[in-house]
Amino acid sequence: MRRFLALLLVLTLWLGFTPLASADVAGLVPCKDSPAFQKRAAAAVNTTADPASGQKRFERYSQALCGEDGLPHLVVDGRLSRAGDFLIPSVLFLYIAGWIGWVGRAYLIAVRNSGEANEKEIIIDVPLAIKCMLTGFAWPLAALKELASGELTAKDNEITVSPR
């Protein structure tokens, strides 16, 4: 029985492990080497008043990776060699979205303490909003400071619990 279980274990491990598969970039090739892309580039249409705008656009796309159809694809697997394609714009988007949210939160906290909070939520106090907006660029540091001090989160006794 021990030999049978040992043989079963060896077979399970041997058949269970698969060789490492490398998809690299899923069959994508540099656009400058793709015949379908070259065909599309030859028929480039100008999109602006610049007579060479179509050609310039395809020169920029030639640095990307193309599929069989000759269209550029985004590689979003975290490789730093392709950081300009997705990583940098996505981090910039998150920073700007956080800035907008932080400034909105700061504005609501500032008007909450005034006597006419409901009115200032509808009719925006522009000087106060600009003041909040100019301090919003450092929102990640301010958020960490408030998180460390406990000001960012609500205390347990301030959270209502459903009677269910």
Swiss-Prot record:
Keywords: Photosynthesis, Photosystem I, Signal. Residues 1-23 form the signal peptide. It holds the Pfam family PSI_PsaF. SUPFAM superfamilies: Subunit III of photosystem I reaction centre, PsaF. GO terms for biological process: photosynthesis. It comes from the Bacteria. GO terms for cellular component: photosystem I reaction center. Probably participates in efficiency of electron transfer from plastocyanin to P700 (or cytochrome c553 in algae and cyanobacteria). This plastocyanin-docking protein contributes to the specific association of plastocyanin to PSI. Belongs to the PsaF family. PANTHER family: PHOTOSYSTEM I REACTION CENTER SUBUNIT III, CHLOROPLASTIC. This is Photosystem I reaction center subunit III. The lineage of its organism: Bacteria, Bacillati, Cyanobacteriota, Cyanophyceae, Acaryochloridales. The gene is psaF.
